[in-house]
Curated annotation (Swiss-Prot):
Note accompanying the cofactor annotation: Binds 2 Ca(2+) ions per subunit.
Active site feature: D234 (proton donor)
Name this protein carries in UniProt: Lactonase drp35
Similarity comment text for this entry: Belongs to the SMP-30/CGR1 family.
Entry-linked Gene3D superfamilies: TolB, C-terminal domain
Binding residues annotated for Ca(2+) 1, in chain numbering: E46, D136, N183, D234, S235
Primary gene name: drp35
Entry keyword set: Calcium, Cytoplasm, Hydrolase, Metal-binding
UniProt xrefs under PANTHER family: LACTONASE DRP35, LIPOPROTEIN-RELATED
Cofactor(s) this protein cannot do without: Ca(2+)
Native source species: Staphylococcus haemolyticus (strain JCSC1435)
Amino acid sequence: MTNQSLPKLTYTGASKSAVPIISESELQTVTAEPWLKISDEGLQLEGLVFDRDHNLFLCEVFGGKIFKVDIDTKKVSTAFQSTKQNPAAVKIHKDGRLFTCYLGDFESTGGIFATDEHGEQFEEIISELNTEYCIDDMVFDSKGGFYFTDFRGYSTNPKGGVYYVSPDFKTVTPVIQNISVANGVALSTDEKILWVTETTTNRLHRIQLEDDGVTIAPFGATIPYYFTGHEGPDSVCIDSDDNLYVAMYGQGRVLVFNKRGYPIGQILMPGRDEGKMLRSTHPQFIPGTNQLLICTNDIENDSEGGSMIYTVEAFAKGHESYQFQ
């Protein structure tokens, strides 16, 4: 038998893509459109959040800048420079303060600090001096407490977890532990379901909570979805129908799940099949609308496309969370 007559594998269909979609290929799929270029450089953008005046804030993890965007003019400015290492998320308290999560050295020096929008009136909320958390993200509940994710560990060393901080910021209570690189976190509209992404094991956690917000209901901790591919699920947000939007880091897309954890749609970044704009990190709604923004960058493509925010219309309007109450 000659080589010419052997059965041959060829790159066809999905196998031509730098990031093939296999198990979700039949989902309703849309491709996002450009909304705003933040920088010509490849910046690790994260933490999209809006204040009451509908100004957009976001952070750049490795460089430490906190950006502010006027959504009417789309003017981008630097709100302040983080004094802490590797800021990974920004959330806004009902009183208007910005709460910034930072990863520190990715091992033992992360925390959360609060400031005004100019980076002033600094207050340490979770101190790196007396904890070992590597804090990636957080979500407020209606009482003013919050859940945060501990980003530590890796696939065979599950050191991460999710913790609840009381409204007075004095008590930290573990909710789930022993997971690998806890990343995105969101609460359902009724605050009964806590969603958590576990990046390095490619898992989605759905946690049903008791009324105290920290006790897991009987049989309430489940993993409704296992993701595939490199790298894994990142930050998340919910809409008013309780659908969950999960950014897929390293894959240039966002997957959408219904309130029971079933995938119902996906949003693709332009150029992903050619390996462009793959570092999709965070989805967030423009308040009062169903317009979803998604930040990503082109670092894996030698930063050719810079750092972008893309947009689509989602299934429903975004859920108006704690800062708008």
